[in-house]
Swiss-Prot record:
Topology relative to the membrane: Multi-pass membrane protein
Magnesium is among the record's keywords: no
Designated name of the protein: Transmembrane protein 179
Location (main, coarse): membrane
GO CC, alphabetical: membrane
Length: 233
């Protein structure tokens, strides 16, 4: 019963990780298509007036687009999380239906993979959160523009890209990444508990085997008495 509960908890966490990763992959892919391969994360720019003698902001000009690697890394990390979560969810569901428990090596390998994904998704989440905050600070000039970052997606910035949904896309991606990170953190915790439990069982088994060997090697009192009697005769 305890094994089934543990496997069910693992399966639920893998399903959540799969779901949240899917929530990330879709908007990031759409944004890459809308921005024609350009990355808005960490983008630098400013508002310029058509007539420099008039202090009126009219058009946003990009000085330097963000590094494409930032968006690609976040998308690839989400895809990896999606595929691994799907594979492990299917495997755990199979064990749950069969009532089978994996070996100590598979549990340890699962712990290493989960810890790696936690680290990877955390980096991707940080990149998206920090990069998108910098983009919003740039296009709103840290709040001096009379429009919020969310409102500016409804205004054509004339950048040669489709910016009609960038805020929604990255808001959803941020939520999905951090939620996915929490799901993988729970998976890693469960994997660690599994490895620790298996280690304790192995240690207990070794202890029992050792005690059995000592008991078998120790002569019984009757045997000792007969040996002493034979020695006296």
């Amino acid at each position: 019963m305890a094994l089934n509960n543990f496997l069910f908890a693992q399966c639920a966490c893998y399903f959540l990780a799969f779901l949240f990763s899917f929530v990330v992959v879709v908007p990031l892919s759409e944004n890459g298509h809308d921005f024609r391969g350009r990355c808005l994360l960490f983008t630098e720019g400013m508002w310029l007036s058509a007539n420099l003698t008039v202090q009126e902001r009219e058009r946003f000009t990009v000085q330097e687009w963000g590094p494409p690697a930032a968006c690609r890394f976040s998308l690839l990390a989400s895809l990896l999380s999606l595929l691994l979560a799907a594979a492990h969810a299917w495997r755990t569901l199979f064990f749950l239906c069969k009532g089978h428990e994996g070996s100590f090596f598979s549990a340890f390998l699962n712990l290493l993979v989960s810890a790696f994904v936690v680290f990877l998704v955390f980096i991707a989440s940080t990149i998206v959160s920090v990069g998108f905050t910098m983009w919003c600070d740039t296009i709103t000039e840290k709040g001096t523009v009379p429009h919020s970052c969310e409102e500016l997606q409804d205004i054509d910035l004339e950048l040669g890209v489709d910016n009609s949904a960038f805020y929604d896309q990255f808001a959803i991606a941020q939520f999905g990444l951090w939620a996915s990170w929490l799901a993988w953190l729970a998976i890693t915790t469960l994997a660690f508990l599994k490895v620790y439990h298996n280690y304790r069982q192995e240690d207990l088994l070794d202890s029992l085997i050792h005690e059995k060997e000592l008991l078998l090697a120790r002569p019984s009192p009757r045997t000792s008495f007969q040996e002493e009697k034979s020695a006296v005769i």
